[in-house]
Amino acid sequence: MTIKLIVGLANPGAEYAQTRHNAGAWFVDALAERHGQSLKEESKFFGYTARLSLAGHDLRLLVPTTFMNLSGKAVSALAGFYRIAPDEILVAHDELDLPPGVAKLKLGGGNGGHNGLKDIQSKLGNNPNFHRLRIGIGHPGDKSKVVGFVLGKPLASEQPLIDDAIDEALRCTDLLMQDGMDKAMNRLNGFRASAR
């Protein structure tokens, strides 16, 4: 199994660019930049895309331009066009159940109430077996505050921790493409950024 598509979940527009809910897109933007690429809008895939060669593998990047709860439209359009199977897809997203400074890789599982993951699963024929990169953003402590929290910007103390976790996830993506998911998972899942 090789990852052929990495998706960064986000809401479109400048007003959302720095919000916690866009952490997945921060990762994909940084991955493109790390490899000297920039994402370009491709309307037939409802998003911004780029193509990389990583460890000898062809890899496509996607940041949907749909709203978060319609992310599956972009993912299924690109995956369908290039015949990419669900288990060859890695979706990077913000994760309330992990603190800032932590990021973890996993295959399948629930959607944790994340509307982007929900829509992707449903548009992939209700198949949850795609990989996820869960980027910790922390939790506001009260369910009723979640929407305001994910659509808010990280605190000044949290942003460097999230950035460090994304940096480690970038290094682990190189490892993933070279040595496989298990090695990348073992390394990333043990990482925790320390406060500066």
Swiss-Prot record:
- Site positions (Stabilizes the basic form of H active site to accept a proton) are D94
Reactions accelerated catalytically: an N-acyl-L-alpha-aminoacyl-tRNA + H2O = an N-acyl-L-amino acid + a tRNA + H(+)
Query: PROSITE patterns this protein is in?
Result: PEPT_TRNA_HYDROL_1, PEPT_TRNA_HYDROL_2
Any one Pfam family here would be Pept_tRNA_hydro
Q: What GO molecular functions are on record for this protein?
A: peptidyl-tRNA hydrolase activity; tRNA binding
**Enzyme Commission (EC) number:** 3.1.1.29
CDD domains of this UniProt entry? PTH (cd00462)
Which superkingdom, per the lineage? Bacteria
In this UniProt entry, which residues are annotated as the site Discriminates between blocked and unblocked aminoacyl-tRNA? Answer: N11
Q: Which cysteines are joined by disulfide bonds?
A: none
- Cellular localisation: Cytoplasm
Where tRNA binds, per the record, is at Y16, F67, N69, N115
BP terms from Gene Ontology = protein quality control for misfolded or incompletely synthesized proteins; rescue of stalled ribosome
Q: Does the keyword Cytoplasm apply?
A: yes
| UniProt cross-references to InterPro entries, sorted A to Z | Pept_tRNA_hydro (IPR001328), Pept_tRNA_hydro_CS (IPR018171), Pept_tRNA_hydro_sf (IPR036416)
Q: What is its main location?
A: cytoplasm
Question: What are the UniProt keywords, alphabetically?
Answer: Cytoplasm, Hydrolase, RNA-binding, tRNA-binding
Q: Name one GO cellular component term.
A: cytoplasm
List the catalytic residues: H21 (proton acceptor)
Q: How does it assemble?
A: Monomer.
Family note = Belongs to the PTH family.
**What's this chain's function?**
Hydrolyzes ribosome-free peptidyl-tRNAs (with 1 or more amino acids incorporated), which drop off the ribosome during protein synthesis, or as a result of ribosome stalling.
Q: Which NCBIfam families match?
A: pth
What name goes with this protein? Peptidyl-tRNA hydrolase
The record lists the organism as Edwardsiella ictaluri (strain 93-146)
